């Protein structure tokens, strides 16, 4: 038995009696139940949960921590929906307060990365009543014509549900159309919290849990991988969190199409839930740990560093997380407008490598599908190999 397992065994002995069998199941790689997941939230101490989650993380990935070189395009923040937690959107009647990018403007953004080693463009925005399925299929085709090798990850299930209904297409028909036009994968946004007791309060007018899951299942059946998210730290309970993760786990059992699970921290700046306090860093780390323990069929757990902040993202790497997203290059406003830690989110490759190394982990650049592009483990830390910047570059 290795030292890590021996240490975990010692920790199990000191855990509350009703948590010891759960820890033993996890070490034996057995699936935990809904009730056991709730118990971990309610009774698990941070050291206990962190040690178990880190054990699972290192069993899957060792010290490897992934990132990619990406940029975002947000076509618009004009939206037909009025989610209570959203600080980003503007109604169509007030579109003069927001932005609406044309196809030409979005292609100009893509062209601005010509010659740069980005591998992914992430396209997501508000649900604009005038930006329909044809508009976006044309955009996808033009991006692929300009840069065929660029992976396009685009559109939340909320956006797609609206597009498909307006086009009078089934989910399967709409997904085939987008895939043929150049869509390669989907992000996980719009999931929020699945349980209707919460969803009917915070985002009652957009696609429900069943619709969200149906769209992702259709994408998986079409041969595309997707991500999954959960918005946490507002009015939901531990039981609501486990219900959400359980529905995702069930779909993953059927399709295997999810790449990664991404918990998203609720931020209370400039929205209709500003009276709701934000979760503590202790609660954040507990959430990451339980997610890693419960989502046993998800290969990856991602912390979105602009939302958490750089130091907290480093900390999450000891609580089950093995992915920190990408360079982003200050191309997203969705979370900065809600008061995220990073108001101008951009890190060079060198800075991301440094951030990961400072946490005692091994930086690995990946593509969207987690194919390894480069392992930075053995790069000379005093060199100027990364973007022409020393690998110990300041994170400030």
Where are these regions (language model features)?
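N-terminal pre-triad scaffold of radical SAM enzymes
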Residues: 48-92, 98-124, 186
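Glycine-rich, proline-tolerant flexible connector loops at the mouths of alpha/beta enzymes
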Residues: 37, 69-71, 90, 94, ...
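Generic structural signal for well-ordered alpha-helices
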Residues: 110, 136-141, 175-176, 213-216, ...
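Hydrophobic faces of well-ordered beta-strands that scaffold small-molecule active sites
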Residues: 65-73, 121, 152-156, 186-188, ...
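Conserved SAM/AdoMet-binding glycine-rich loop
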Residues: 117-216, 220-228, 234-235, 300
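Conserved, mostly hydrophobic/aromatic
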Residues: 29, 53, 83, 123, ...
């Amino acid at each position: 038995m290795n030292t890590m397992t021996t240490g975990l065994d010692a920790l199990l002995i000191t855990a509350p009696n009703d948590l010891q069998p759960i820890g033993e199941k996890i070490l034996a790689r057995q699936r935990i139940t809904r009730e056991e997941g709730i118990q971990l939230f309610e009774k698990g101490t941070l050291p206990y949960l962190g040690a178990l989650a880190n054990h699972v993380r290192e069993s899957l990935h060792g010290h490897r921590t992934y990132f990619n070189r990406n940029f975002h395009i947000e076509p618009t923040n004009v939206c037909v929906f009025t989610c209570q937690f959203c600080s980003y959107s503007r109604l169509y009647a007030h579109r003069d307060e927001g932005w609406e990018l044309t196809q030409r403007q979005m292609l100009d953004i893509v062209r601005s990365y010509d010659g740069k080693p980005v591998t992914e463009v992430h396209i997501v925005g508000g649900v604009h009543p005038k930006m329909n399925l044809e508009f976006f299929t044309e955009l996808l085709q033009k991006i692929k014509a300009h840069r065929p090798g660029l992976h396009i990850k685009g559109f939340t299930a909320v956006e797609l549900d609206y597009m498909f209904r307006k086009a009078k297409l089934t989910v399967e028909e709409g997904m085939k159309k987008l895939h043929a036009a150049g869509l390669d994968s989907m992000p996980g946004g719009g999931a929020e919290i699945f349980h209707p007791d919460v969803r009917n309060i915070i985002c009652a007018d957009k696609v429900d849990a069943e619709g969200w899951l149906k769209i992702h299942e259709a994408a998986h059946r079409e041969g595309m991988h997707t991500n999954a998210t959960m918005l946490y730290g507002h009015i939901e309970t531990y039981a609501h969190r486990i219900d959400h993760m359980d529905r995702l786990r069930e779909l993953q059992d059927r399709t295997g199409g999810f790449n990664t699970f991404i918990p998203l921290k609720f931020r209370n700046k400039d929205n209709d839930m500003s009276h709701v306090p934000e979760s503590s860093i202790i609660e954040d780390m507990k959430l990451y740990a339980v997610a890693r323990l419960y989502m046993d069929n998800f290969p990856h757990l991602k912390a979105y560093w602009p939302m958490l902040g750089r130091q907290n993202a480093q900390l999450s790497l000891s609580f089950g997380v093995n992915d920190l997203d990408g360079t982003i290059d200050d191309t997203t406003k969705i979370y900065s407008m809600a008061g995220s830690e990073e108001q101008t989110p951009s890190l060079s490759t060198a800075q991301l490598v440094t951030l990961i190394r400072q946490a005692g982990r091994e930086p690995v650049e990946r593509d969207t599908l987690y194919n390894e592009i480069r392992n930075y483990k053995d790069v000379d830390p005093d060199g100027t190999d990364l973007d022409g910047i020393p690998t110990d570059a300041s994170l400030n």
